[in-house]
Design a protein with these regions (language model features):
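Mg2+-dependent phosphoryl-transfer enzymes with acidic/Ser/Thr/Gly-rich catalytic loops
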Residues: 9, 13-15, 33, 158-240
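Conserved acidic, metal-coordinating active-site core of Asp-based
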Residues: 97-191, 199
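Walker B catalytic acidic pair
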Residues: 22, 300, 379-380
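Active-site phosphate-binding/coordination module
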Residues: 29-114
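Short, well-ordered beta-strand core segments
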Residues: 50, 73, 194-196, 211, ...
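Terminal, compositionally biased segments used for targeting/anchoring and flexible tails
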Residues: 450-586
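P-loop NTPase catalytic phosphate-binding loop
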Residues: 240-375, 384-406, 410-414, 419-422
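Conserved ATP-driven motor cores of ASCE-family P-loop NTPases powering translocation/secretion/packaging/pilus
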Residues: 400-404, 411-467
Length: 586
């Protein structure tokens, strides 16, 4: 939906992790051409992280000084990992068992032995499969240009690189992979963009986003010059499988933002209080995290701490007595798969600016050297970025050129002008204040035939390279203030849950999650079974309480065909645990 921004002059943080197959890709007959060596040195000097991924045995390639350019090397098709800075070698998938090796050799298969794998040549492929079938062991067999490799289960170039990236602190969401052979398929599919050289096998070209016009190392040099090294690099294609859905457009089609647009650019989300801007922001946060991007939400109102319900999302509370230093937040974010909500709702307002300014400074090395977090959301941005500037804006402005920021506010006119000038796109909900609307300038003028003040509740406009009107999707995690409201406070009468069995209504109803839990503990099991078998509980929790997380749990329980008191115990345990988690997070 929105334009992607090219990596130019080292300014953008996206696609700065590059992984190369060796034979046929970097090297020709085992040698890396001098011009390509120079290009790799330039990439390394500019701050890119380089990895080599090869089917060769550990230390089986003559790299000499080139090895110093790589952050890590994946040997033996993913089975052996070398973390160069730590000088550690890992075998994450184990190794081929001795009995299988003996069986292969006993069948007359000539083997080349690695640390974790064995290999032979194509003429022995049928014998290898016969031995595997007779032996009954578990192994992975890969083929590449006349070589047959037998790997431990789970090993592949992509799987090995993913493990090594995590060990080195890098994310696959910053990765571009280069290859030529059959065994490079998982490598190209791991990252954001896959590049195949012109003489790559057809099956690899099918999954590549870019195919060079030159073969082998010349093709790699062509790609590096086109997309990284020249003065005005071309835009590098990114996989289309990572759109972040926002909602239904005017024609009923889905409106999405490309994750690359959020990582490379800066977003403003503006609208009146209660107009839905935090809901839309939450959709994007959930979508980015779900797609594997690391997200940091700076949350002064406590609206996003419910994100802790998502696997891999941590909610960290800052208050007057418990003040985790900014370096602790960065330490949490050093784990590639962890996203963080920083809840400042109980932290004294007068101390927030200093804390957030320190945090932004502390994040700089992680952003510059590991290119993460991919996306940082500053809620209630008007409190931290006033028009006259402050410590936060001073720390922040130098980082905006890299992209990957979102600013959420009901008063964009109260934001420092340098931030507004750096916005690449906006999501706008109803905005009635004239000065706030005027501050958006051309962004607001893109909306046709309607003023910002007249945007209906439940609608939003996406503005930037193109314009789209949408109705936001449902959330994975309900808006936290809505959830808390109905923990103990009664729902409107028409939303109560009315219990019955297969004969009649019981004249018992639940008006809140607490009352629902009490009913589960005391009502006849026949009533609970009646409703659970029909999916009534999950529907009410989703539509009445707006709690999609608990509704999903109840749907999964319904699939287990539980009976009698076992059903009651499972329902009570699930609902009670969820209630306690929400209550503790208030």
């Amino acid at each position: 939906m929105l334009t992607q921004v090219a990596v130019a002059g080292g300014l953008k943080m996206y696609r700065h992790v590059l992984a190369f197959d060796f034979d046929g890709t970097l090297a020709e007959q085992g040698t890396v051409p001098l011009a390509l060596q120079t290009a790799l040195e330039q990439l390394h000097t500019s701050g890119c992280a380089l990895f080599m991924v090869t089917g060769r045995r550990c230390a089986g390639a003559q790299l000499s000084s080139l090895e110093d350019l790589f952050a890590g090397i994946v040997w033996e098709n993913g089975a052996v990992l070398h973390h160069i800075a730590a000088d550690e070698v890992y075998l994450p998938f184990g190794h081929i068992g001795a009995h299988l090796v003996e069986a292969l050799e006993g069948a007359g298969v000539p083997l080349e032995h690695g640390r974790a794998t064995v290999s032979t040549t194509t003429p022995h492929n049928e014998t290898v499969w016969q031995v595997l079938n007779e032996w009954g062991g578990d192994a992975t067999v890969v083929h590449n240009r006349g070589v047959v490799r037998v790997l431990p289960p789970g090993a592949a170039k992509g799987a090995g690189l993913e493990r090594l990236l995590g060990l080195c602190g890098f994310s696959p969401r910053n990765l571009v992979s280069f290859g030529d052979g059959e065994d490079d398929r998982s490598l190209l599919q791991l990252g954001e963009t896959g590049v195949a050289v012109a003489d790559a096998v057809p099956s690899l070209k099918e999954v590549a986003d870019v195919v060079t016009t030159q073969p082998g190392p010349a093709g790699i040099l062509e790609a590096l010059d086109t997309y990284w090294l020249k003065g005005s690099p071309s835009e590098l294609p990114t996989r289309r499988e990572r759109p972040i859905p926002l909602g239904a457009g005017a024609a009923g089609t889905q409106v999405s933002l490309a994750a690359a647009a959020l990582v490379n650019g800066n977003l403003g989300v503006f609208g009146d209080s209660g107009s839905g801007k935090s809901w839309v922001t939450g959709l994007l946060v959930e979508g980015m995290h779900h797609a594997g991007y690391q997200v940091l939400v700076i949350d002064p109102e406590g609206d996003f701490k419910g994100m802790r319900a998502l696997p891999g999302f941590v909610a960290l509370e800052v208050n007057a007595s418990t003040i985790p230093p900014p370096t602790m937040v960065v330490t949490l974010l050093e784990a590639v798969t962890v996203s963080v909500v920083l809840d400042l709702s109980l932290f004294p307002v007068a101390r927030r600016d200093d804390y957030v300014a320190e945090l932004v400074d502390a994040l700089r090395p992680l952003r510059e050297h590991r290119f993460r977090p991919h996306w940082i959301v500053l809620e209630e941005a008007q409190h931290f970025l006033p028009p006259n500037g402050n410590k936060v804006s001073s720390a922040l402005l130098a980082m905006l050129a890299r992209g990957g920021w979102a600013f959420v506010s009901y008063r964009p006119d109260r934001l420092v002008g340098d931030v507004l000038a750096k916005l690449d796109h906006c999501i706008l909900t109803r905005l009635r204040d004239l000065e706030a609307a005027q501050a958006l300038g051309q962004m607001a003028n893109q909306i046709p035939e309607v003023s910002l003040a007249d945007i209906p509740r439940g609608h939003a406009w996406l503005c930037g390279q193109s314009v789209a009107r949408l109705r936001p999707n449902a959330r994975r995690v309900p808006h936290i203030r809505h959830l808390y409201k109905y923990l103990d406070t009664p729902l409107p009468k028409h939303k109560h849950f009315h219990f019955r069995d297969d004969r009649h209504f019981l004249r018992v109803e639940a008006a809140s999650l607490l009352e629902f839990l009490q009913c589960l503990r005391t009502l006849p099991i026949e009533s609970l079974a009646y409703h659970q078998e029909r999916g009534d509980f999950a529907r009410w929790v989703k539509s009445g309480l707006g709690d999609g997380i608990l509704a999903d749990h109840l749907r999964k329980l319904a699939q287990r065909s539980l009976r009698g008191e076992t059903l009651r115990e499972a329902l009570v345990q699930r609902v009670a645990t969820h209630y306690e988690e929400l209550h503790a997070a208030r």
